[in-house]
């Protein structure tokens, strides 16, 4: 009877190797040693951990929208931490417009590394003008430098009516014209076989430095003084308007390092502070010396006053008594009785001796002495006794004054 090839129970000789491997695997499984309990627990824990990992990863995979093709999906890249915008602190008594200028330069124009130098109190003032505030900033490139300076000048003219003189700024079309002319010169040199100049040449295109000088802006109400106000008959150059000069120095990074204005003006400020400190110390020492001398003189003066509580100087009494006599003989044509003379002498002596010598004017003393001397030289007096007395007392006055 022929074997049916379609009957599954019939063994096919072509696939005999399958039966041998199956049998061998079965025999091997029967001959293996039994699995320990520890291995069973380990396999169970590993399986549970894999299940938890797959369950945790399932929401992430489900979160991805499969309707968007892979080439349109946006993978959030790790962005670099941006540096916060740093605006320098305002100096004491700042102009009202200074904060607006700093915010525009830093935020709108996008210049970096701002530094503010307060040069308002420099003596003598800088060449850029008295009461100067200097701002130094860095641009990212040559093009950024010119765009920022041009926008800054237009902003000041449009918003605040200020005219900024931007030295080194190239206009919007001027840069293209200069580059075209430079390329044309290079082509001409190449055609005639000339060598192209090498090195960092100043061709007037790459400046790397723009100095924006603002016109005077309004000063703080507490900062309205002018240089030389405390000097009588001031001689020199200064502006009458009590404003503040602001200068913005814009650099590329390489040019700023090369120029190094911070070190220059920082040294000037340090020198002025050092000189001011030395002057203040000297004034303080001088004040202390004066106070010490005054404190030492006070007990000495009080001691001298205690010791000199005596009557007035005899010379002073002689002088003022002789001045009283001149009232008796100030008019040679007038006759006085003895009673009148005695009363006048008593009144004038009491009045004059009750005052100090400093209370009388020098002109009065000189006039009185002149009249006494005139009487001494021979003016006629009615009574001989009075004449001799007047001459003797006039001699005493002249001797005391000598």
UniProtKB/Swiss-Prot annotation:
Chain's role: Probable mitochondrial mRNA stabilization factor.
Primary residence: mitochondrion
Region spans: Disordered: 1-60
Family assignment from sequence similarity: Belongs to the ATP25 family.
Transit peptide location on this chain: 1-32
Extent of Low complexity compositional bias: 44-58
Keyword Transit peptide annotated: yes
GO (cellular component) term, any one: mitochondrial inner membrane
Coiled-coil region(s): none
InterPro entries: Atp25, NT_sf
Alphabetical UniProt keywords: Membrane, Mitochondrion, Mitochondrion inner membrane, Transit peptide
Protein name as catalogued: ATPase synthesis protein 25, mitochondrial
Location(s), subcellular: Mitochondrion inner membrane
GO biological process, one term: mitochondrial gene expression
Gene3D superfamilies: Beta Polymerase, domain 2
Membrane topology: Peripheral membrane protein
């Amino acid at each position: 009877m022929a074997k049916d090839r379609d009957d599954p129970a019939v063994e096919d000789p072509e696939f005999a190797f399958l039966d041998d491997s199956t049998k061998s695997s079965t025999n091997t499984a029967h001959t293996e040693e039994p699995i320990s309990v520890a291995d069973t627990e380990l396999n169970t824990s590993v399986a549970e951990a894999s299940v938890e990992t797959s369950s945790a990863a399932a929401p992430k995979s489900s979160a991805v929208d499969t309707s968007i093709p892979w080439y349109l999906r946006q993978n959030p890249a790790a962005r670099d931490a941006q540096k916060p915008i740093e605006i320098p602190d305002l100096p004491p008594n700042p102009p009202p417009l200074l904060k607006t200028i700093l915010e525009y330069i830093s935020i709108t124009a996008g210049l970096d590394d701002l530094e503010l130098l307060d040069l308002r109190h420099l003596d003598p003032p800088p060449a850029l003008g008295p009461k100067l505030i200097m701002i130094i900033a860095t641009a990212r490139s040559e093009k950024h430098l010119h765009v920022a300076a041009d926008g800054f000048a237009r902003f000041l003219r449009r918003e605040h009516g200020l005219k900024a003189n931007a030295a080194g700024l190239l206009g919007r079309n001027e840069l293209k014209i200069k580059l075209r002319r430079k390329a044309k010169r290079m082509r001409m040199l190449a055609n005639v076989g000339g060598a192209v100049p090498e090195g960092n040449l100043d061709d007037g295109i790459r400046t790397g430095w723009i100095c924006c000088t603002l016109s005077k802006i309004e000063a703080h109400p507490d900062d309205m003084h002018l240089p030389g106000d405390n000097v009588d008959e001031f001689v020199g150059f200064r502006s009458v308007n009590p404003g503040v000069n602001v200068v913005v120095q814009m650099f590329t990074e390489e040019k700023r390092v090369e120029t190094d204005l911070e070190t220059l003006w920082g040294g000037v400020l340090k020198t002025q502070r050092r000189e001011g400190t030395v002057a203040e110390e000297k004034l303080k020492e001088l004040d202390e010396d004066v106070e010490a001398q005054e404190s030492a003189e006070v007990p000495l003066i009080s001691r001298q006053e205690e010791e000199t509580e005596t009557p007035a100087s005899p010379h002073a009494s002689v002088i003022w008594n002789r001045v009283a006599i001149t009232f008796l003989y100030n008019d040679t044509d007038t006759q006085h009785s003895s009673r009148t003379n005695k009363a006048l002498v008593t009144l004038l002596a009491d009045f004059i001796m009750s005052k100090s010598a400093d209370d009388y004017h020098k002109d009065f003393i000189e006039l009185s002495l002149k009249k006494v001397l005139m009487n001494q030289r021979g003016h006629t007096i009615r009574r001989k006794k009075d004449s001799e007395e007047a001459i003797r007392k006039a001699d005493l006055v002249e001797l005391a004054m000598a």
